[in-house]
């Protein structure tokens, strides 16, 4: 159960960080 909770927290952290960066500075895919 610890592994599942750890994975869930890591995923949530990565998603939160991704959205924070995306909303702060929209990525330019067309370089």
From Swiss-Prot:
InterPro entries, alphabetically? Answer: PSII_PsbT (IPR001743), PSII_PsbT_sf (IPR037268)
Q: What is one GO biological process annotated to this record?
A: photosynthesis
Thylakoid as UniProt keyword: yes
- Gene Ontology CC terms, in alphabetical order: photosystem II reaction center; plasma membrane-derived thylakoid membrane
Q: What membrane topology does this protein have?
A: Single-pass membrane protein
Family, per entry: Belongs to the PsbT family.
How is this protein organized at the quaternary level? PSII is composed of 1 copy each of membrane proteins PsbA, PsbB, PsbC, PsbD, PsbE, PsbF, PsbH, PsbI, PsbJ, PsbK, PsbL, PsbM, PsbT, PsbX, PsbY, Psb30/Ycf12, peripheral proteins PsbO, CyanoQ (PsbQ), PsbU, PsbV and a large number of cofactors. It forms dimeric complexes.
Q: What is this protein called?
A: Photosystem II reaction center protein T
> What organism does the record attribute this protein to?
Prochlorococcus marinus (strain SARG / CCMP1375 / SS120)
Ranked from the top, the taxonomy reads: Bacteria, Bacillati, Cyanobacteriota, Cyanophyceae, Synechococcales
Report the gene name: psbT
